Amino acid sequence: MTKDLNKKLVLGILFIFPLLVYLFFASGKNNFAKLPILTEKVNELPKGYLGEKIKLKNKITILGYWGGDLKNKKAEALNLNEKIYKRFYQFDDFQFVFFVDTFQIKQVQELKNELVKGVGTDISRWNFLHTTAENMKTHFSSLKTPFLLDESGNTPYVFIIDKDLSLRGRNDDEDSGTLYAFDARSVAQINKKMIDDVKVILAEYRLALKIYNSEREK
């Protein structure tokens, strides 16, 4: 009995300890804390104009709103592709989703071509949701942030949405106090903050999965 218990304890430590170490080093000042929830019950995604059925539920999502402004989004897209997507796209349930205007079909394809040409990455987890300006505004308002979309339905800010449709971010950021989103124009902010925060939320879910699997094996 004691031997079995000791064996389970050792196995538990072997599974969990490396994840705790990873979480500690990946999370910067967040240490072992989960990435804070800033807004709960973000709206689920509407069905796309082209029949897209992309969902936030049960996904870890980098969410953006580019509206009808794709011609000016190449730099932001390449920043995110190189610094975030390329680094994390192989994690289960990780995705990028960007709202775009219903008439941006050609522009989306051109941008995808640039992304592939830029880093040669599999971009199957880059999702573009074609929808109306009204749908974009309605969904954006459910984030409950201080930001606004411009007239074309665009913002340079991208958001982390967890599997339960909650907006994650920082509530103790040294620069802004509450950090709702990341400026895709700023390589410095992506490097300094966004990479760390994506690592934290991915490690959080990996740790939860390890604990769940460990409990099932008992």
Where are these regions (language model features)?
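N-terminal targeting signals for export/organelle localization
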Residues: 1-49
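Short active-site neighborhood of thiol/selenol oxidoreductases, capturing the structured segment around
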Residues: 53-81, 96
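Thiol-/selenol-based redox modules, centered on thioredoxin-like
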Residues: 154-218
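Surface-exposed short loop/turn segments
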Residues: 132-154
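Solvent-exposed coil/turn segments that connect beta secondary-structure elements
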Residues: 68, 102, 133-134, 163-165
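Structural microenvironment flanking redox-active thiols in thiol-disulfide oxidoreductases
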Residues: 74-129, 133-139
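Sec/Tat-exported extracytoplasmic proteins
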Residues: 84, 88, 143, 147, ...
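Extracytoplasmic
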Residues: 57, 91-94, 153-156
